[in-house]
Amino acid sequence: MAGSQSQASTLVARGGRSSSNAPTGAAGALRRRPVRGSGGSGTTKAQQAAMNFYTDDTPGWKMSPVVVITMSLSFIAFVTILHVVGKFQ
């Protein structure tokens, strides 16, 4: 028993390797990501299509999200006021 390690004293790393094969320091804590193709931002065709949909020059009113939310809340408040006024008449 002096030359061999017991089961309790052997540390097993996250990947299932014993502590004698496990990398030490920061290399042991971080795993490398697989290498992707040649450069680029990594956007897919679906993401590019979505960006084109939102950035294309389309006919219609151009409104920011803040304007849309403000108008929606105003409409909800107006309908609520109409219900309250209609209840008391």
From Swiss-Prot:
Membrane listed as a keyword = yes
Q: Which GO terms describe its cellular component?
A: Sec61 translocon complex
Give me the segments passing through the membrane. 66-86
Q: Where is the composition biased (Polar residues)?
A: 1-10
> Origin, by domain of life?
Eukaryota
Bilayer topology term: Single-pass membrane protein
Q: Name one GO biological process term.
A: tail-anchored membrane protein insertion into ER membrane
UniProt subcellular location:
Endoplasmic reticulum membrane
Q: List the stretches on the Cytoplasmic face of the membrane.
A: 1-65
The segments labelled Disordered in the record are 1-46
Keyword list, A-Z: Endoplasmic reticulum, Membrane, Protein transport, Translocation, Transmembrane, Transmembrane helix, Transport
Please classify the protein's predominant subcellular localization into one broad category.
endoplasmic reticulum
Q: State the family named in the UniProt similarity comment for this chain.
A: Belongs to the SEC61-beta family.
What biological function has been recorded for the protein in this entry? Necessary for protein translocation in the endoplasmic reticulum.
Subunit relationships: Heterotrimeric complex composed of SEC61-alpha, SEC61-beta and SEC61-gamma. Interacts with ARSA2.
Name of the molecule in the record = Protein transport protein Sec61 subunit beta
Give the classification, highest ranks.
Eukaryota, Viridiplantae, Chlorophyta, core chlorophytes, Chlorophyceae
Per the record, the gene is: SEC61B
